[in-house]
UniProtKB/Swiss-Prot annotation:
Residues of the signal peptide: none
Function: Catalyzes the reversible phosphorylation of UMP to UDP.
Localization: Cytoplasm
InterPro entries with a match to the protein in the record: AceGlu_kinase-like_sf, Asp/Glu/Uridylate_kinase, Uridylate_kinase, Uridylate_kinase_bac
Protein name: Uridylate kinase
Known EC number: 2.7.4.22
Assigned keywords, A-Z: Allosteric enzyme, ATP-binding, Cytoplasm, Kinase, Nucleotide-binding, Pyrimidine biosynthesis, Transferase
Amino acid sequence: MKYTRVLLKLSGEALMGSQGYGIDPEIVHSIAEDVAKVVASGTQLAIVVGGGNIFRGLKGSAAGMDRATADYVGMLATVMNAITLQDGLERAGVPTRVQTAIAMQEVAEPYIRRKAMRHLEKGRVVVFGAGCGNPFFTTDTTAALRAAEINADVVFKATKVDGVYDKDPAKHPDAVKHDHLSYQDVLSGELGVMDATAISLCKENNIPIVVFDLFEPGNIGKAVAGEPIGSRIGNPV
């Protein structure tokens, strides 16, 4: 099964590679090359990017910042990542538009659903920045929301691990990977894949989620082609 329209969720942490902070140009280049191949095959691709490599609202809140203020700072961090991704994608020959949920017309278009869909139909990648524009909502929830709005076939959550495990594989060598999970399995199991709001939105709109390793070259293309990589979350077959 080949997906026609895909929403790719990238965490901010994924962009920093092994640096511990900021953006690794090599990672951006690698992602751009993979995305270029996928778009050339005819797949429509939208991206939601996080901002945790620059600023994380929850950490700011824990350090004493007002939670809403911290979340707004985090949203601005996602815009920095979105513009950086746009640059990398366009250098790889992929026409790209950035749309933000907070207006900043000098650097990006405002988020307009119908315009985003038109860009996708014309073969452009759309990178969504500034989360959903509201504090207290994660970028995972934004990914689920935008996927529903643009009628995406699937949400890809590209991460540092190759799927969903019953416990953290970095800490537990005996962790077991799940190939298939229902939305309810994730909600009741507290597996930490996405927050409950994001999972619930996907469940309500019957949008499957595929979790896979971003750093394995070609994985985005394999996921688009429907190859059995990572872990798939959806309704029971």
